[in-house]
Design a protein with these regions (language model features):
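Iron-sulfur-associated redox domains of electron-transfer enzymes in respiratory
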Residues: 1-165
């Protein structure tokens, strides 16, 4: 059972990022991917074998790219970092975040509430702005099926169970 999260209001996110000059966008290819696949009716994951979790996370990568393009068009410099399960990080993941941080005045987190807390704990001395992009609403049980192309999985909406808190 994963955490079910939805995107926060687009205007709220744009307002929060208004004063940012350089953004580090951290995304998670875990529960956020399934949540975005369900919420936005996007392909979930590539079915091709041999891809790592980030490369196969179609929905979260599509949403991340859309936001990077939007923020870049606003004159922001945006770098991205994918961390697999920031809710339960290894030291190497923490080090990757800390080494990517210099030069960024804003961190945007495209992940669930648990990931936000985990990343926030690492950044306790960070003086910049931290913006959660998603809001966790509960948990989910999803059945994944092949999409129309046969190349991706997608969430079967008819059998989806979302347990809202």
């Amino acid at each position: 059972m994963g955490l079910y999260s939805v995107m926060r209001d687009e205007n709220l996110l744009l307002t929060a990022a208004q004063s940012a000059r350089s953004i580090l966008m951290i995304s998670c290819p875990g529960c956020a991917c399934e949540s975005l696949s369900y919420e936005e009716d996007l392909p979930n994951r590539l079915l091709e074998q041999g891809k790592d979790m980030d490369s196969s996370a179609v929905a979260v990568n599509m949403v991340r790219t859309r936001w990077v393009d939007r923020l870049t068009a606003m004159g922001k410099q945006v770098d991205t970092l994918s961390v697999v399960f920031p809710c339960e990080m290894f030291d190497t993941d923490r080090e990757a975040i800390l080494s990517a941080l210099p030069g960024h005045d804003t961190v945007m987190i495209l992940a669930c509430g648990s990931a936000y807390i985990g990343i926030q704990d690492i950044l306790k001395d960070y003086q910049g702005t931290i913006i959660p992009m998603m809001h966790t609403k509960g948990s989910f049980v999803f059945r994944l099926v092949k999409d129309e192309t046969g190349k991706h999985s997608k969430v079967e909406r008819a059998t989806a169970r979302i347990n809202k808190k």
